[in-house]
Amino acid sequence: FELHKGEILGFAGLVGAGRTEVAKCMIGAYRKDGGTVTYKGETLSNSLSRNIEKGIVYLSEDRKDEGLVLMHSVMDNIALPNLKQLAKPFIRKKEMADRAKDYIKSLRIKTHTHLTEARNLSGGNQQKVVIAKWLYSNADVYIFDEPTRGIDVGARDEIYNIMYDLVNQGASIIMISSDLVEVLKMCDRVAVMREGVLEAILDNSPDLTQETILKYAMQGGI
């Protein structure tokens, strides 16, 4: 499949269909059994750190265990993937604090201070911290895995707006979601997986329905 610049490509399917596995193979977190991932004409390696440097980032569905270090501050979590930038020639604490404060303001992260531990934030605000740390890296491709799971309605809309802002600025997004209402609301096209196989890529036209997506997800090619 192809991901276009400024596009949100949805990935739908039943639990266990292989959507997260595809995403982790793309970024180099899982080793591929076959096939290649090409980005800007270059075949990507199986190195997660190198692919992040190239501008491809993954926001895990498990933000508490994979997305955040809960016992560390909001500032530390935002800075962690970006220490290479911040450590030239030494770690610049003031810049870390200033950047964290900027993201707290721009993403409307509800926290007492930038030094508040991530474990003390709500689910929606934790997700915003995860987003902030990758915004800091100026990525081009964002893979959002179940980005609004366990988040209240108000925070969900804020996450959607952040995603819209990203694509309006030229980034591309892959959005893995089990919420078909969300998929139809957000995505330009929908890739449907079943038992590890990509069954279809559907244009999100006014005629596309949840029922059609479910048919592909449950029965395969129609």
Language-model regions, residue ranges each:
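Glycine-rich phosphate-binding loops of nucleotide-dependent enzymes
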Residues: 1-222
